[in-house]
Amino acid sequence: MVTSPHPLASAAGLAVLERGGTAAEAAITMASTIAVVYPHFCGLGGDSVWILADRQGRQTCFMGIGQAAAKLPDFTGDSIPLRGPFSTLTSAATVDAWEAVHRYSTEYWGGKQVFGDLLQDAIHHAHQGFPVSRSQGFWLDMRKDVLAEWPGFINLFFNNGQPFAPGEIFRQPELARSLEDIASHGPRSFYQGTLAQRIAEGLRAAGSPITLADLAATRTMQVEPSRLSYRGLELLAPPPPTQGISTLAIMGILQHFDLSALTPGSAQHLHLVVEAVKQAFLTRDRIADPDFADQPVQEWLSAERLQRAAKAINPDRALAWPHPYRTGDTVFFGATDASGQSVSTLQSTYFDWGSGVVVGDTGILWQNRGAAFSLDPQSPNFLQPGKRPFYTLNPGLALRDGKPALIYGTQGADGQPQTLAMLLTRLIDYAEAPTQALAGPRFLLGKTFSDSRDSLKIEADCGQPVLDRLADLGHQLAPIERQSPIAGQAGVIAIAPDGSLAGAHDPRGEGVALAAY
C-alpha cells in the first residue's frame, strides 16, 4: 500500500509494488514523481527525511539535510531573507537521500529495481506534462507577486504572463533532462557530475553562496530514530536537528492523561492536546545540529521531565502561548510492501515555492532552508559554515511488538507535531480508522502566513459547543473553515496484527492511498 498527496505519485509507487519492488523502491519513485507534480512544496532542490522499519526488527532513519555553504555572505540585518538567493544558503540533499535509501533496500530488503528505472514516471510527467493541481494553483496565485522577481520563476511557472491555473497542462522539459541525467549517470551526478557543474553555475549566477565543492560535500546521514513508548506502541521520529522529539514529547505528556475517558474531538480532548503542545514546545528552540550544539534528547524525553510537563497542565485553564512561528510546507508519503517493510517520508523545499530561485537551465527550484538559521550568536541555530539548520520535517512510524503498525506524517512546519498529536490520539486512544482520524477537526496554535495573532486556529466543524467551551477555558480562538489547508495534509497507513492494511490521505487535499492486490 502507498499513500501520497498526489494521485500520480501514488499510482507510480503502486506500480513499483505490483512489479515486486520494495516499499523503499516505491517510495523513491513517489519521491521523484512528487518532485515533478507538486513543485510548490518539494523538489530536487530540497531535502527529505526518511524512517524505515521491517518485521525483522530493523529500524533506521535517513536524514537528507543539506549543510550551509562553506563560505557564507556577511549579513547586516537582524534576519536572513525569506526568499531569493540569500535564502539559498544550504545544499540540497534529497537526491542523495534517494540513493542512500535505494542502497539500504538492496542490501537489507532484497531490492532489485534499478535506480534509474525508479525515476521514469517522474521523467515522463516532466516531459509530457500533467494537469496543475488545485494546491499548486492556489499557492501560485497566493505567491505570484512575491516570487515573480526571482530568477527564472516566471519563465517556468507562468503561462503567457499569468500563473498556471488548476487543470492546465504544465510541462518541465529542463527538469526532465536533469532527471534523465540522474537516471543515466547516478544520483551523485547531482553533486559531482556535469549536472552538478550546471547547478553550481546556475546558483552562482543567481547570487547563491553554494558552490560545486559544497554540492560535492553533501551527504545523507544514517542515524538511529528517537523513540517513545505510548499505549503499548513504540513511536519513532527523526532526531535533531528535526523537531521529531517535539512530537514525541507531546505524546509522552499526553500519556499521563486518560484520553479514552474523553469523547474524541471534545473540548477537553482538544484542550489537553493544545496544552501538551505548549509544554513540549518550550524546549523546541534549543533543537539544533548535534554536531554544533549539545542535544540531550534522553533528558528532554525522560519520564521525569514529561511527568513535570503533564503536571503543569491545568485541565480547566489555558496557559499563555509565547512561541515564535515558523512557516513552511512539505509533502508526506509512505509505503509498505507484502513483506511488511515500511517507509515514512517527508520531502520539502521549506516554504511553499522554496526560495523562488530556479537554478540556471536545470529546471530545479532551490529551497530557502537557509532562512531557518538565526543571526543571533547566542542561538543554537546561529548560521555557521557546514551547519544544518533546525528542521521541521518529522515523519513518523509506530511499532507494535517491534513490527510496523502505523506509518504517518503531515505537511505544515510548526503544525506538524500538532497535527500528528491529534491524529495519533484518534488512531491509538480512540481506535479510529485512518479515514475517520484524518477527517476529524484539527487546530493550529500560533501565527500563520495569513494571521499574525498568537491564536488557536480551529476548524469550525468541531461544533459551536466545543468552541464555546474552549473559549471558557481561556483559549483565544480564531475559527477556520472546515478541513482547511491551514490544518495540514496528513497521510496514514495502518497495519493490523494480522497484516491487513487500511490507508488514507487527507481530505484537505487531493492525495490518495492505493493498495496492491
Question: For each of these PLM feature ranges, what is it?
Answer:
Residues 1-11, 15, 21-185, 190-192, ...:
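Noncatalytic scaffold domains of N-terminal-nucleophile
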Residues 24, 36-53, 58-60, 209-212, ...:
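Active-site rim segments in enzyme catalytic domains, especially the processed small/beta chain
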Residues 24-31, 115-127, 198-200, 264-281, ...:
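Short, well-structured alpha-helical segments that form the helix of a local strand-helix-strand
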Residues 42, 47-54, 331-336, 395-397, ...:
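Short beta-strand scaffold segments in enzyme catalytic cores
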Residues 222, 327-330, 391-393:
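Short, small/polar residue-rich loop motifs at catalytic or cofactor-binding pockets
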Residues 237-240, 245, 398-415:
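Extended C-terminal regions of large enzymes
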Residues 256-349, 361-362, 369:
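Internal maturation/activation junctions in enzymes
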Residues 339, 387, 420, 429-484:
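Extended C-terminal subregions enriched in glycine
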